[in-house]
Every structure is written in C-alpha cells, then in structure tokens.
C-alpha cells in the first residue's frame, strides 16, 4: 500500500509540474519577443552522425519520438507487471476498468466522427478525444485529499492502464506510415534477441539497453511510430530475479528508476514542447470548426458518457462491482476526470495532423479548454460526492 501511495503522490506532483510547464509554454508562445526564442528551441536540429549513418532531427521530434518512447517503455513495464502480478491479474479485477475504458474510447470517437465524417482529412483526428492524462487527473484527485477513497484512485490507475493499451493499439494500427522492409527486418532481429534474453532470464540490463536502442532506431527508420519500440522492448524485461522473486526483479528495478524521470522530466518537457499555443484571432475563430468542436465535445461529453454508462451497465449486469467505499456520484465524477486529455491528446493530435498545421493552434486550444472544463467539473462533482457520503 505504501508503494501505491508513493506512486500516487508522485503522479499528482507530476500533474502540477506539467501544468506549470504548459503555462510557461503559453507565456513564451504569446510573447512577441520570447516567441522567437521558444520557436527556435523547438526547431533546433541535433543528432548523431556515424559514418554514412545520419540521424538528425529538430528538438520537437526528439521529444515526441525519443523521450515519448521512454515514456511508453515505462507504460509497457507497468502494463506487464499489473497484468502478471498486480491490480489486473484476474478477470474480476480487470472487468470494470476494461469495460469502462472501452466506453471511454468508443463514445468520444463516435462523437468526433459524427462531426467530421464529411471530410476524409478532418476525420483523421478521431482518436484525439479517446485518451486521458492520468497525471493531471490524479493531481485533481489529490486536491481533494483523504476525502476521496483510495479505491477510487486505484480504479483510476487501472482505467489508465486500459486507456494506455487502447492508445498503443490505435497508434500502431491507424497512425503508421509507409514501411521500410530493411528497417523492419533489423527490428525483427532485435526482437528475436530480446526474446532469447527474456527466455533465459538474463539479468544484464546493458544488453537489453543496447537491443532497445537498436530497436528504437530501426522502428524510427521503418515508418512505424518510434514510441512503439518502447512498448515492444518493455515486454521482454524479465519480471523475476534469479531467485524467481518479482518484487526484486529487473522490471521493478527499472520501473522505480524511470518513474521520477518520466514523471518529473519527460512529461513536463513534452508538455512544454507541445503546448505553446498562440492565441490569435484566427485560432479562436477556428474553434467553431468541426475538428476542434469534435475534440471539445469528445473529451468533455464523450468521455464522461462513455466511461460512466459502460461502467453502470457492467455493474447492473453483475459483471463488475463499484469500488469499495464509492457511490455512483464518485464514479460519475471520476468519469468526468477521464476527459482531461492534455499531454496524451496533444500527442495524438501531432500524429493525426502531422502533415498539416491547418488546425494546429485551434486543436491545442480545444484540448486545453476541454481538459480544463473536465478538471474543474470533475473536482466539484467529487467534492460534492465526498460531502454527501459524510
């Protein structure tokens, strides 16, 4: 329980740090003098040259393709542990977050599609309102302190894991470009080596690190989004140590090492790099376009309806139970909080419209607006739920 408590505390602190990073990005982007400095940082090219091999990218892509690969590697480690040893290691435990998570993907996607189906390019962003930012949601929960049952926080974490699985599948299937056969072959070779290492329960972290780097570069060059390399590599990190103990295995060690790096460095840097919205007259007027509207309605309306209605049906059909100590109002308030998309929605937005900046600032404003609405509304609903319970 102490491990979970520490985890939650770090996640909430990370959410606050992400908010500060986004505020700083907004200040820089909307200041006439500092905007140029901010833009030049994001466009600055850097990379590696080794003989004929060159890997040169601007800062923004190093963040989105590199640092976010580490983020997804960490998420993959969490998924593996939770499905094998943790909160999702049985059907009864996984039922409610799984069913609620499915609703939280389907309903927002349908709302976005209904508003944008007339234009084949616009509809590419259907996945933007389907994801959640757990760090932000946990930060809101912790503002309420001990008034919120620990079971509700654990349910949010379980729901976040299901949400991450959905995001991984969506990125792999719908946001992958043309493929390079040679790079895919190198990726396959790296995966084979990782499989052998895992089968033999090899405990040398440096071999896994080397294979992971080769896998990341080859996936990046293949046309598949590089963040998937992180997920793939994480699946091969040994769960148990040489004595068969999962609590002291490499997976737990790497998770504990990466957690503060992801929470306090990678996610704030990502937020700072992607949240620099210029509040121009055009970007404000473009909020009435179906794409930004689809994002706003998908996150604020679709998420809460999808998560709550699917969870409600699952409980009424005896497929799952309400978290201990929670009432329906708790569940509804949490459902609203899942609409806080922030960093993950910004990430999917960058993939969906990578070849165009037609909705660049309007989409970011829509994500910020909808996420803020969800955070504020969810906070007051949960506050009322805690008072009603007392």
Swiss-Prot record:
Catalytic activity: Na(+)(in) + 2 H(+)(out) = Na(+)(out) + 2 H(+)(in)
Keywords on record: Antiport, Cell inner membrane, Cell membrane, Ion transport, Membrane, Sodium, Sodium transport, Transmembrane, Transmembrane helix, Transport
Ranges annotated as spanning the membrane: 14-34, 59-79, 94-114, 125-145, 154-174, 179-199, 205-225, 260-280, 295-315, 328-348, 362-382
Cited Pfam families: Na_H_antiport_1
Annotated localization: Cell inner membrane
GO biological process: one example: regulation of pH
GO molecular function, one term: sodium:proton antiporter activity
InterPro entries: Na/H_antiporter_dom_sf, NhaA
Topology term for the membrane: Multi-pass membrane protein
GO cellular component: plasma membrane
Protein's job: Na(+)/H(+) antiporter that extrudes sodium in exchange for external protons.
Similarity comment: family membership: Belongs to the NhaA Na(+)/H(+) (TC 2.A.33) antiporter family.
Protein name: Na(+)/H(+) antiporter NhaA 1
Chain's gene name: nhaA1
């Amino acid at each position: 329980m102490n491990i979970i408590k520490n985890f939650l505390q770090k996640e909430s602190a990370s959410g606050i740090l992400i908010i500060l990073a986004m505020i700083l990005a907004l200040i820089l982007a909307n200041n006439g003098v500092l905007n140029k400095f901010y833009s030049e940082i994001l466009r600055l090219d850097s990379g590696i040259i080794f003989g004929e091999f060159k890997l040169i990218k601007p800062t923004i892509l190093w963040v989105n393709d590199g640092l976010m690969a580490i983020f997804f590697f960490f998420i993959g480690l969490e998924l593996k542990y939770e499905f094998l040893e943790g909160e999702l290691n049985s059907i009864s435990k996984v039922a409610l977050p799984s069913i609620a998570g499915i609703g939280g993907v389907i309903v927002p996607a349908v709302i976005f599609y209904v508003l944008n189906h007339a234009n084949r390019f616009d509809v590419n962003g259907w996945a933007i309102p389907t994801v959640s930012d757990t760090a932000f949601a946990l930060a809101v929960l912790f503002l309420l302190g001990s008034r919120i049952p620990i079971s509700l926080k654990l349910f949010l974490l379980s729901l976040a894991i299901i949400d991450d699985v959905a995001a991984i599948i969506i990125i792999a299937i719908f946001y992958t470009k043309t493929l390079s056969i040679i790079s895919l072959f190198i990726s396959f070779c790296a995966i084979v080596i990782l499989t052998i290492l895992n089968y033999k329960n090899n405990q040398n972290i440096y071999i896994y690190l080397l294979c992971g780097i080769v896998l990341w570069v080859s996936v990046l060059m293949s046309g598949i989004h590089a963040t998937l390399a992180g997920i793939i590599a994480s699946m091969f990190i040994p769960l148990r140590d040489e004595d068969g103990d999962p609590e002291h295995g490499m997976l737990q060690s790497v998770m504990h090492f990466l957690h503060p790096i992801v929470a306090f460095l990678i996610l704030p840097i990502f937020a700072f790099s992607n949240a620099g919205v210029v509040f121009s007259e055009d970007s404000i007027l473009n909020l009435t376009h179906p794409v930004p509207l689809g994002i706003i309605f998908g996150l604020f309306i679709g998420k809460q309806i999808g998560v709550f209605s699917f969870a409600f049906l699952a409980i009424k059909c005896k497929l799952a139970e309400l978290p201990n100590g929670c009432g329906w109002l708790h569940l509804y308030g949490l459902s609203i909080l899942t609409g806080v998309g922030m960093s993950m929605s910004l990430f999917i937005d960058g993939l969906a419209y990578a070849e165009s900046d037609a909705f660049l600032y309007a989409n970011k404003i829509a994500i910020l607006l909808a996420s803020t609405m969800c955070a504020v509304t969810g906070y007051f609903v949960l506050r009322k739920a805690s008072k009603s319970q007392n």
